[in-house]
């Protein structure tokens, strides 16, 4: 193996050393670098990772706009007095808030919070914009960064002090309208993972003790990582009337009676990139589904000097046809790099589909297509290359989804008591479902020894334990069970 091949290769094991493997993939695939010395918790997002984020952003933004959402932008800084108007926000985020206290050499009259979330700066403006029931529903979203000064170890795209996300905020005339909004956004988040990123997810709600500060209900999509930990992959909050009361969002109804609005907020961050990388990638490097890959297909011509001209001409024609069809294609016709090096490099970078073209393909009017996830090689006719490539994109997506779905299906296990929960989590990881009384105190006997928690409870319609007279008792305290709890370690 050459020095270049050694430099390209992934040396850590995904199954035995997941954290180090993940960090190596992120850096060697050119996705991110760590921030400057003295700024732990910050990363530099490199163009290839940002391109994936842009694809995700475009997919989700289109769904938002199709359902009545308009984009806006609000200040990065939030006056302390604004935060204090919603006490639950203050209590929930205060340990993580970064404050600006000086501008130039002058001390500010009021501290400014660097945006940890924007309810406190957006809601006052919604209050100004809403006067009548005719102004409702009102829906705004912003794509931005937020800062939360967490002390945990930096893990690119999973745990950083600054991260990219979108946050949507809406106001509605009724409780039912706000709940429908909450579920619409949750379904759209699930679609991002399942339809774009080829990742099955679980949908449910957070237990009351873990819901968003000030929320009536927090709904969540949870994704399972290969190390058996869960990722909170997106949340949608039914805020009830707490924020509307704090910030005076009122409207006159059809009878000219003054009413308090019902609000929601919902957000998805670049944690989705971390979950994507960790779920599909392998010990050859990054693996991406075609929908978000910066380069969807790479064409690699393979020639000897006496066949170079005809092979390159054939390969250029294939690449041009794909490019004209809107497929993101790269023609790798570099001199000085042998085909094996090119194959390894594009595998490391996660290109979903490779087309190999040598003298035999030219002579026979064919193409050799290789799938990134499993290395499957298929010979196809040159004619109709665009439709052929699109079909293979579908196959690559299906392979990725099927593998992830099989992993998730096999990682949900049942338990009836504390010892069983701890033993199953310790041996297998993943999700352990157990009957739960609804008391936060019954999470502690699992959290303390195992660092696991209740990451989700199913919605009432999906949970047999939400019905009366089921006869189940809590796995921890033996009181009557009210819900099914999903216990897991989490990022």
UniProtKB/Swiss-Prot annotation:
Q: Which Pfam families match?
A: HGTP_anticodon, ProRS-C_1, tRNA-synt_2b
UniProt KW keywords: Aminoacyl-tRNA synthetase, ATP-binding, Cytoplasm, Ligase, Nucleotide-binding, Protein biosynthesis
User: What GO molecular-function term can you cite, just one?
Assistant: proline-tRNA ligase activity
Catalysis performed (reactions) = tRNA(Pro) + L-proline + ATP = L-prolyl-tRNA(Pro) + AMP + diphosphate
Top class in the EC scheme? ligase
What cellular component GO annotations does this protein have?
Answer: aminoacyl-tRNA synthetase multienzyme complex; cytoplasm
Keyword set includes Cytoplasm: yes
| Keyword presence, Aminoacyl-tRNA synthetase | yes
The EC number(s) given in the record are 6.1.1.15
HAMAP family attached here? Pro_tRNA_synth_type3 (MF_01571)
What does this protein do, in the record's words? Catalyzes the attachment of proline to tRNA(Pro) in a two-step reaction: proline is first activated by ATP to form Pro-AMP and then transferred to the acceptor end of tRNA(Pro).
Family per similarity comment: Belongs to the class-II aminoacyl-tRNA synthetase family. ProS type 3 subfamily.
- Matching NCBIfam families, A to Z? proS_fam_I
Q: What is this protein called?
A: Proline--tRNA ligase
Q: Which organism is it from?
A: Halorubrum lacusprofundi (strain ATCC 49239 / DSM 5036 / JCM 8891 / ACAM 34)
């Amino acid at each position: 193996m050459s020095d270049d091949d050694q430099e390209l290769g992934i040396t850590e094991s995904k199954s035995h050393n997941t954290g180090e493997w993940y960090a190596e993939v992120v850096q060697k695939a050119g996705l991110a670098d760590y921030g400057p010395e003295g700024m732990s918790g910050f990363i530099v997002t490199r163009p290839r990772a940002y391109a994936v984020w842009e694809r995700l952003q475009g997919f989700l933004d289109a769904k938002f706009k199709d359902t009545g959402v308009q984009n806006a932008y609000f200040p990065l800084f939030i006056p302390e007095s604004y935060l204090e108007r919603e006490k639950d926000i203050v209590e929930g985020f205060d340990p993580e808030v970064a404050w600006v206290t000086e501008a130039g050499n002058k001390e500010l009259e009021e501290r400014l919070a660097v945006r940890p979330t924007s309810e406190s700066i957006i809601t006052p403006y919604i209050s100004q914009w809403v006067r009548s029931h005719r102004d409702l529903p009102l829906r705004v979203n912003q794509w931005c960064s937020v800062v939360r000064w967490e002390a945990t170890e930096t893990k690119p795209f999973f745990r950083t002090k600054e991260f990219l996300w979108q946050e949507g905020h809406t106001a509605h005339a009724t409780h039912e309208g706000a709940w429908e909004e909450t579920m619409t956004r949750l379904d759209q988040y699930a679609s991002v993972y399942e339809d774009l990123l080829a990742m099955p997810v679980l949908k449910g709600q957070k237990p009351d003790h873990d819901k968003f500060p000030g929320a009536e209900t927090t709904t969540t999509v949870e994704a399972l990582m290969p190390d058996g930990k869960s990722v909170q992959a997106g949340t949608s909050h039914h805020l009830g009337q707490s924020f509307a009361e704090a910030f005076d969002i009122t409207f006159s109804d059809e009878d000219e009676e003054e009413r308090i609005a019902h609000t929601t907020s919902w957000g998805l961050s670049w944690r989705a990139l971390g979950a994507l990388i960790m779920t599909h990638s392998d010990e050859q490097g990054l693996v991406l589904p075609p929908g978000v890959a910066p380069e969807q297909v790479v064409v690699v011509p393979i020639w000897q000097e006496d066949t170079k001209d005809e092979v390159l001409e054939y390969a250029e024609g294939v690449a041009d046809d794909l490019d004209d069809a809107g497929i993101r294609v790269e023609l790798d016709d570099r001199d000085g790099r042998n085909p094996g090096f090119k194959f390894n490099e594009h595998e490391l970078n996660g290109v979903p589909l490779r087309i190999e073209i040598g003298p035999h393909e030219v002579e026979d009017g064919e193409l050799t297509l290789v799938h990134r996830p499993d290395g499957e090689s298929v010979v196809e006719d040159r004619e109709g290359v665009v439709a052929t490539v699109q079909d293979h994109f579908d196959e690559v997506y299906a392979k990725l989804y099927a593998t992830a779905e099989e992993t998730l299906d096999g990682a949900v296990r049942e338990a009836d008591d504390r010892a069983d929960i701890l033993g199953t989590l310790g041996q297998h990881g993943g999700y352990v479902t157990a009957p739960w009384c609804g008391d936060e105190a019954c999470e502690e006997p699992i959290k303390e020894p195992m660092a696991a928690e209740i990451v989700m409870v199913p919605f009432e319609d999906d949970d047999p334990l939400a019905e009366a007279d089921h006869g189940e008792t809590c796995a921890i305290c033996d009181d009557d069970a009210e819900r099914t709890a999903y216990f897991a370690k989490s990022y």
